């Protein structure tokens, strides 16, 4: 489920009711605290490993997972819903006869887990009868007993519910006082407590935290019935509740005064600004279609990176293994061998699972592989993909990239997108200096609607805020802006990237993939970047 789909459900008033069935059983807030004892989890894991080995499996991994989520949903002066969910169980994956088998159980006893392991073994043996080539697992060292935790300062689950609700209602009141007609604000809080064990000799305990604080402001012209919205400029993050402290050092002010945010977010300040900007959008002139140089803020660029780089460079899409859910990829294996020109020489795109504050940042993936950072595009040329253990041999790698993930103990892990990011420019360059060189352009802030084809080649992107640039100066707000692109042509048009001081993360809290669908969270970083000669359309115009 994509984050925009989730917000749409909230707007219809049905999202809250759907939450428990999607994420687990509804529980009291107090049940979101604490964790299973590590020794208990190890006993369960050993029971599964021993049963799988006794059943003739050549490999087994076990994931003991406790998934905790809290959603607080408000509209104007009202709390519409508070949902706490908890889901705990064990997922067991085995190799037998060169084929995979998987089974899961929520019976947290050694006997229950051993039974599930034997079921997984039986499934693998049945699958092996139709397996055309055996699974080849890239080796990974046994790590012994290790642990990793998101480096948070405040555990969101330990913050009193009243404090969270009061924050949202205070944000809403400030936006309404500033001229908003309607305000929706939410808190999505996640804690994944994951224990991994395998016959390789790893026992990995991880405590992963994520937070997202979206809001939507609506302004209405009562004389005409026209309305405009402005979504919040927060980013979902791999942080604790300290993200909402509003640290002033993490504010990024654009040349025209729009405030963006880095590793800390002032939700109230953003809501007040959004109310003013949503009202300003009501009278903003509509864009004239044509070719423009685009200056794209990181709050916008993350989505373009996600769709035009992150997804097409997932190896399962490249190979055609993943097709039904949002397509395959134009970036086929022959293009990697030929060092295909994915973008201009300024473009360096990396994948990583270790970025501080990122949604995808963990110590180890769901195959027990220690995470890392690696190149996808270097100096504009395609050099690599995102791979997991049973894919590595296909591209000649000796090890996995460490980007395997399952969204639940009851789901089998598979290849998921790492944090894919555009590296900052190497030369000192501010946003103001970048804009000074633009004769005819548009400055875009925030993400909006988008569309992309099944090969991740042709796409269209909107945004939240659009500003005309004429002769090196921001002149006025525009409306009804979207740009069209072909992936390699768009990235070839990248002519400037601001330096590291402007670098920020954006991301998707609910990124869907697979059938049955699984949701993951992933960040994408960049500094403000310029793209020349991009086709802009007017979304308010109709054909005919």
Write out the residue ranges for each language-model feature.
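N-terminal small-residue-enriched
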Residues: 2-544
């Amino acid at each position: 489920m994509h984050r925009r789909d989730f917000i749409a459900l909230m707007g219809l008033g049905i999202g809250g009711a759907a939450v428990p069935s999607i994420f687990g059983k509804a529980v009291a807030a107090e049940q979101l605290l604490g964790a299973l004892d590590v020794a208990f989890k190890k006993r369960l894991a050993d029971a599964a490993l021993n049963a799988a080995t006794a059943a003739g499996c050549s490999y087994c991994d076990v994931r003991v997972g406790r998934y905790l989520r809290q959603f607080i949903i408000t509209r104007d002066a009202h709390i519409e819903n508070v949902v706490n969910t908890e889901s705990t169980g064990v997922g067991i994956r085995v190799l037998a006869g060169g084929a995979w088998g998987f089974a899961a159980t929520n019976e947290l006893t050694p006997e229950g887990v051993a039974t599930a392991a034997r079921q997984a073994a039986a499934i693998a043996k049945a699958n092996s009868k139709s397996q055309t080539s055996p699974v080849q697992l890239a080796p990974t060292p046994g790590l012994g007993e290790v642990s990793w935790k998101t480096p948070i300062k405040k555990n969101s689950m330990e913050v009193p519910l009243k404090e969270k609700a009061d924050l949202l209602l205070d944000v809403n009141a400030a936006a309404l006082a500033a001229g908003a007609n309607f305000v929706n604000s939410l808190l999505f809080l996640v804690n994944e407590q994951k224990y991994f064990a395998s016959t390789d000799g790893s026992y990995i305990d991880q405590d992963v935290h994520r937070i997202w604080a979206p809001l939507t402001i609506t302004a209405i012209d009562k004389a005409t019935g026209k309305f405009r919205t402005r979504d919040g400029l927060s980013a979902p993050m791999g942080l604790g509740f300290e993200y909402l402290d509003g640290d002033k050092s993490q504010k990024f002010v654009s040349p025209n005064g729009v405030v963006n945010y880095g590793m800390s977010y002032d939700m109230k300040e953003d809501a007040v600004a959004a109310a003013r900007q949503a009202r300003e959008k009501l009278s903003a002139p509509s864009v004239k279609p044509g070719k423009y140089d685009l200056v794209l803020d990181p709050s916008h660029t993350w989505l373009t990176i996600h769709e035009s780089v992150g997804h097409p460079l997932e190896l399962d899409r490249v190979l055609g293994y993943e097709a039904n859910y949002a397509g395959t990829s134009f970036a086929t294996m022959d293009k990697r061998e030929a060092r295909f020109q994915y973008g201009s020489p300024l473009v360096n795109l990396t994948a990583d699972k270790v970025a501080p504050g990122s949604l995808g940042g963990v110590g180890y993936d769901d195959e027990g592989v220690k995470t890392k950072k690696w190149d996808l595009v270097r100096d504009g040329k395609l050099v690599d993909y995102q791979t997991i253990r049973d894919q590595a041999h296909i591209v000649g790698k000796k090890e996995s990239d460490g980007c395997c993930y399952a969204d639940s103990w009851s789901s089998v892990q598979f290849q998921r997108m790492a944090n894919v990011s555009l590296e900052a420019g190497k030369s000192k360059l501010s946003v103001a200096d970048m804009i000074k060189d633009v004769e005819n352009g548009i400055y875009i802030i925030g993400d909006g609607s988008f569309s992309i084809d099944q090969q991740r080649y042709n796409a269209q992107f909107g945004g939240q805020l659009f500003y005309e640039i004429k002769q090196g100066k921001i002149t006025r707000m525009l409306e009804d802006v979207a740009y069209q692109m072909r992936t390699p042509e768009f990235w070839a048009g990248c002519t400037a990237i601001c330096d590291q001081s402007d670098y920020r993360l954006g991301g998707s809290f609910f990124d869907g993939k697979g059938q049955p669908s699984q949701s993951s969270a992933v960040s994408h970083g960049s500094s403000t970047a310029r793209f020349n000669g991009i086709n802009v359309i007017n979304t308010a115009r109709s054909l005919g």
